[in-house]
Each structure stands twice: as C-alpha cells, then as structure tokens.
Amino acid sequence: MDSDDLQVFQNELICCICVNYFIDPVTIDCGHSFCRPCLCLCSEEGRAPMRCPSCRKISEKPNFNTNVVLKKLSSLARQTRPQNINSSDNICVLHEETKELFCEADKRLLCGPCSESPEHMAHSHSPIGWAAEECREKLIKEMDYLWEINQETRNNLNQETRTFHSLKDYVSVRKRIITIQYQKMPIFLDEEEQRHLQALEREAEELFQQLQDSQVRMTQHLERMKDMYRELWETCHVPDVELLQDVRNVSARTDLAQMQKPQPVNPELTSWCITGVLDMLNNFRVDSALSTEMIPCYISLSEDVRYVIFGDDHLSAPTDPQGVDSFAVWGAQAFTSGKHYWEVDVTLSSNWILGVCQDSRTADANFVIDSDERFFLISSKRSNHYSLSTNSPPLIQYVQRPLGQVGVFLDYDNGSVSFFDVSKGSLIYGFPPSSFSSPLRPFFCFGCT
C-alpha cells in the first residue's frame, strides 16, 4: 500500500466530530460512524431527536453497539502513528536510554535496563503503544460509568420537576378532601380542620423548597459530570506517553462523582388524626367483608397501564419489571345501597390493591385498574422506593404508606369511597362524589413479595 492509499485508509478511521482516530466507534442507522462519546456529548447539547452529524438524517435508535472491526483498525492506526518518545523528558537519567516500556504495577515509564532491575523485574511490562490502548479502554469504561451516573441524574432531575408540579396539584386536592371529610363529621371540628389545613400548607412549602433545592443540586452535578466526561474524552486523545503519565487518579474521580450524586427528594405529607372519625365509621362496620377464597392472579403496576390478570392467564402474562404474582380476594357480598365500612390488614405485602369495583368475579374477568367503576388504593414497591396511589385518574398520594390496617368506607347512595389509616385515625384519600350504576364489591389483591 503506497503512502496515498495509506492516507486514504487512515482518513476512514477518523471521526468527523473530534477529527481523531475513532475511540469506541458506533455505526448509526444511516451507516455513518462516530465515537460514542462524541455522540453522547452532541445529544447532551440538546440535539434531539438525534440527527447524524454528517447527513442530518434522524437516528431512531438511542443506543448502539460498538463497531468492533472499526475499533480494532483505529487502535492499530494509533499504535503505528509516530510517537515523540525520544524527547529529553522521556530519556532515563540513569541509563540514558529511551523509556519504551510501561510498568503496570507502578504506573511508570521505564527503559529496558530499568525494567530488568530488582525493583521492577517481577512486574508486568508492556510497550508504550499497547499500554496506552489498554489505558484508553479503562478510560472508556470510566466514561461509560460517568455517563450512566449522568443519565440517572438527568432522569432524577426530570422526575423531580414532574414531582414538583404533581405535588402542587395534590396539595390542592388534599385540601378539598380534608374539608369534605370534616363536613361529614357529626361534631363541629372547625379549629382542628383549620390547624390541619395550615399544617398542610407549611409542610407543602417546605417540600416545594426541598424540591427546588434538589433541582439546583442536580443541575450543578450534571454540569460537573459533563466537564469530567469531556476531560476524560480529551485525555483519550493525548499522545501515548502523556496519557500514561496522567492515568493515576481517574477511578478516584469517578468514584467521587458517584458519592456526590444528589439523591431525589421523596416528598411525604403528614396525615393528621381526625377526632372521632373511627368511632363514626365503626357505626357502619361490616364483619367478614372479604371472602376466604383466594384467586391467583398477576398485577402489573407499570406507568403505561396497570392491570390484573386472573386464573391461568397470569402464567402467560408478558414480562413486566413492575409485575407481581399475587392473590385476589373478593368481597363476600356486593353492595347496592347504604354505608359500609371494613378494615383490611396490609402488613404482609408491599404491593397491594384495595377498594371496591364492579361485581365481576369470574376467572376470566381480567381488568384494567384505571377504568370506570373501580375505586382503588394502590401500594407498590420499585427498587427500594414505596409508592402510594389511587386510580381513575392515576394520582400519587404523597402521604405515608399505611403499615397496618387500612379502613375502606363506601357510601353508595352519595357515590363516595374513602380510605383511612386505622393506626393514625387519619384520612388517606376520598374519591370525589359520583353516581354508581352497578353493584360494588370489596376487592383486595396482594403480592407474593
């Protein structure tokens, strides 16, 4: 291969973004190839949907596999390029020979005689070009790790923003349901109601401030991550000798980035005790509200759609990270009028659905949770985070998850369903009044985990 052909070949191994030999190259949908870090930095600058920097076509796939062949060729091209290893700084003072070897144990450049000395004889040594490529591989892994932290922080920041707006809406809803519940009480509790509303307002303001502070911390952390990522990326492109002399503290920096990663706020409001509420509810208590017959089922609590599958169908349910093998228990009777109250122990499971729904107990009556004539309080656990919500429409409940008995109150004639934390004597949530058109039966579904 003559020099012109060699130059053409080498040009095919150069990323058009950073104008350096490819490092961790990926080939996107249109067929053009780039360094993965270059694409990451482009996407971080807001170029979404991602367009090819060469032909401007939109790339549908967010993640790409490394082009292994291109990676190997680029590595070979780097190792064959001229290296300024004969500079005075790279001459061994003791033996006056060029340092052409790298000691992995001591992270030092050595000349031949030094590598054979008693101090280094037992260590592993490799040529500078090969060692530099190994170092770049380690840098790429550290960059991948940094990018994971970056993406996790960005997701947390987006979630924090959604939580801020969601909490604002929830506080307004909670004020209304507290006021409605006090209006139902047989005794006048105006002062207690005002204390609860004022306490709710104070707690909410504190949580809003925490969420705003958290968003600032996450934004600052993202900027630090981006700077660190870019710094490592630039380090990958420095000459081999300089690279090997600057490799010591990379892991320490990325470990520090992980330790300094801001954690999202988990907002939780206090549900205050309402004087006499349990005494009032117990006037309508239903004994043995739930049947003793348990039906195997599968519950999915994903963000897209929440559903329950009964009988053998649950064995073929699609794989779902938020799916839980469960058991369902229906009420012993359906209600068509009157007021009814019962309590259910939720101690044994983190994932459960409790409430009332249309009277449909056949094994093939699979249903979507967020649909009409279903009024549920839902507890779910994802990773180490517990969430409490209601359905129709889906609404996160920013109050502490009940750990013992949960009370369910159905006022059929007035079209209302409410949930209470029995241990606290407090209101969890009350659905807005509606008009029921069919018999309603108690329902409880609890996960096996």
UniProtKB/Swiss-Prot annotation:
Domain B30.2/SPRY: 269-449
Binding of Zn(2+), residues: C92, H95, C114, H120
Top-level taxon of the source organism: Eukaryota
Protein family membership: Belongs to the TRIM/RBCC family.
One Pfam family cited in the UniProt record for this chain: zf-C3HC4
Zinc finger (RING-type): 15-56
Coiled coil: 189-225
InterPro entries: B30.2/SPRY, B30.2/SPRY_sf, Butyrophylin_SPRY, ConA-like_dom_sf, SPRY_dom, TRIM/RBCC, Znf_B-box, Znf_C3HC4_RING-type
Keyword Metal-binding: yes
Keywords: Coiled coil, Metal-binding, Zinc, Zinc-finger
Membrane-spanning segments: none
GO function terms (MF aspect): ubiquitin protein ligase activity; zinc ion binding
SUPFAM superfamilies named in the record: B-box zinc-binding domain (SSF57845), Concanavalin A-like lectins/glucanases (SSF49899), RING/U-box (SSF57850)
Name of the protein: Tripartite motif-containing protein 64
Zinc finger (B box-type): 87-128
Biological process terms in GO annotation: innate immune response; regulation of gene expression
Annotated GO CC locations: cytoplasm
Residues making up the signal peptide according to the UniProt record: none
